Amino acid sequence: MKRGFLLGMLSVCCLTAQAGPQINVGTVYDYLDADKSTYLKRVFNSGDATAFVKVNVLEIIYGADGVPQEVPVQNAADGASRNGVMASPARLIVPAQGMQGTRLLYMGERDRERYFRVRFVPVVPEKEDEFVVSSEEREDYKNSLSAGVNVMTGFGTIFFVRPKDARFATVINDTEKRYELRNDGNTVLIVDEFKSCSLSKESDCGATTKHHVLAGKTFAFDKEKGREYRFFLIEGSEKKSMKTASR
C-alpha cells in the first residue's frame, strides 16, 4: 500500500464559528472480519455544542499501476441495494460531551477483499442535509456559532472488508542485509509498531510506524549494521512479536 495513502487518512474542514463541536472517531483503521456483515463505528463529541455529522462512503479501487482511486459505491445489479458499504444512519446528531454510533453495513459478494474510505464531516445543518431539525432549530444553531472563529474537524477512516474465506499466508525472507515479508494470503496483514533501535544504545530508535500489507504485496527494508528491527505482525486476531537485527 502506498505510503502516501496510509498517511493521508485525516481531512480537515474549517468553518467560521464560535467554540462548538469537537468530534473524534477513535481508530483510523477498521476491519470487517470474514464472518461479520456489520460494524459499529462510534462518534464522540468533546465540544460544548451539538455536532451535526454527515457520514460519506467511497470505495477505494487500485488501478493496474497500483494507484488508488476513490469512487462512489455502486448499486447492485438489481438496483434495489448497494454493492458495498453503506452507513446507517448517514446523518448523526451528537450532543455536546456525548456519543452516537453508525453501523457500517456491507452488502454484496465477499469473493475478494475490498476497501472503503468513510468520512465523518461536521456541518452547519441546511434544509437539504436531511437532518431531522426544524427551521427554527437550524437558525438557532447558526446564531450560536456566529460570534467568532472555530475549526470543525472532519475525519476520514479506512474500512477493510475481508473476503468470506479469509486466508493468511505470510512468507518471510530474512538475510543479513535485507528483510522481506510477503503476503501470499488473500487479505490484509499489519506490520504494527515498527521501529529500529541501535544495539549499542537502546534509546537510539527511529520513529514508530504502521504498515498495511495487501494481498500479493511485500513489506521490505534494508538492514543497517548495528541495528535491531522490532514490530508486531498482526494476522486477523493473531498478534506475533517479531524482531531481526544486523550485527
Q: What is the role of each PLM region?
A:
Residues 43-49, 106, 179-187:
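Asparagine-centered strand-capping/turn motif at beta-strand->loop junctions
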Residues 34-40, 100, 113-117, 175-177:
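Short, solvent-exposed loop/turn segments enriched in Ser/Thr/Gly
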Residues 4-15:
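Sec-dependent N-terminal signal peptides
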Residues 51-79, 121, 186-201:
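Short acidic, flexible loop segments centered on an aromatic residue
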Residues 20-49, 165-174, 210:
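Beta-sheet-dominated interaction scaffolds and their linkers
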Residues 58-60, 107-166, 229-247:
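Terminal connector regions
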